[in-house]
Structure formats: structure tokens, C-alpha cells
Design a protein with these regions (language model features):
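Compositionally biased, low-complexity segments enriched in small residues
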Residues: 1-4, 20, 33
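Bacterial N-terminal signal peptides that target proteins for export
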Residues: 2-14
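Bacterial N-terminal signal peptides
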Residues: 12-22
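Aromatic- and Gly/Pro-enriched helix-to-coil junctions and flexible linker segments
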Residues: 23-154
Length: 154
């Protein structure tokens, strides 16, 4: 009798999660290390008033950033889940989002993951964003908002 060696679905799922995490971590390591004061050089007010709205905006053919980046997973960028019935974050949640998102930003660095990762490859982005290329070009107003924050807008 010949026994077929089959991989368990659980092992396959664990391998996929591991490989997805490894790819994301290598992306995070590919940008320069932020200085100790990186989060203080980014404007919390601009983030709260303009950047968080980008994460909530529904774009044609895509899901909202908040849909994937609030689940407990191995993604580099994480957002606080919205409170039940809420359409935006409260002050405490926004401060936590600011801290978490600041980790994927090097202030003033044009290739920070936050602005490169969701940008279409033809426009200078990369292919590894599991949520697809959210921004077709650098002319997209939401992409320009993210870039403005990364580049130091107040």
C-alpha cells in the first residue's frame, strides 16, 4: 500500500502567514532607520485631520485601508479598529494610530513605505501591497496627502 504524503492545511496556512510576514518585514528593513526624533518631526495634527481620512476613504475597486490594517496580523502598518458604530477614531485612538503609522515613515524620505507601498508600480510603487495598488498615480489627492505628511506638512 502506497501512502501519499500530503501537507496539512494548517501547516500550509502557517507557511503562508510566515512568508507574508517575512516579505513585509524585509520591506520595512529596506528603508533607512528613523532617527530617535522621527515621530516628533511628523505633525500629529496633520495626521489626525488629513491622513486618517485617507485610511477611511473607499476607492473604486479597492477596500478601505482600515479594513485590512486593523486586524491582528503580521502587517507592518497597523491601525486601531474603529469603535462599534463610529465612522472615525477618537483622540486616544488617533494618537495610537499616529504612533503605529509613524513606524513605517522616515520623515522627509520619498521612499517611505507609507507612500511607496500602495502606489501603482508604474508610478514608482512596489508590487508587494496585498491590498492592491490603491493609488494609480502620484496625482491622486489621497496619495499627495500621505506624501505631504511624510515630507513634513504641518
Amino acid at each position: 500500500m502506497h501512502r501519499t504524503n500530503r501537507i496539512s492545511p494548517y501547516v500550509a496556512a502557517a507557511a503562508c502567514v510566515f512568508l507574508a510576514g517575512a516579505g513585509t518585514l524585509s520591506l520595512a528593513r529596506s528603508q533607512p532607520a528613523p532617527s530617535a526624533t522621527a515621530s516628533t518631526s511628523l505633525s500629529y495634527e496633520f495626521f489626525r485631520d488629513k491622513v486618517e481620512a485617507v485610511f477611511l476613504h473607499k476607492r473604486e475597486g479597492h477596500t478601505r485601508c482600515v479594513a485590512c490594517h486593523t486586524v491582528n496580523n503580521v502587517m507592518t502598518m497597523h491601525l486601531v479598529p474603529l469603535s462599534p458604530g463610529a465612522t472615525t477614531w477618537n483622540e486616544e485612538q488617533s494618537r495610537q494610530n499616529f504612533q503605529w503609522v509613524s513606524r513605517v515613515v522616515v520623515p522627509g524620505y520619498e521612499d517611505s513605505l507609507l507612500i511607496k507601498h500602495p502606489l501603482d508600480e508604474k508610478a514608482g510603487g512596489d508590487l508587494r501591497h496585498g491590498g492592491g495598488q490603491q493609488f494609480a498615480s502620484k496625482d491622486d489627492p489621497d496619495w499627495q496627502t500621505l506624501r505631504a505628511w511624510v515630507m513634513g506638512a504641518k
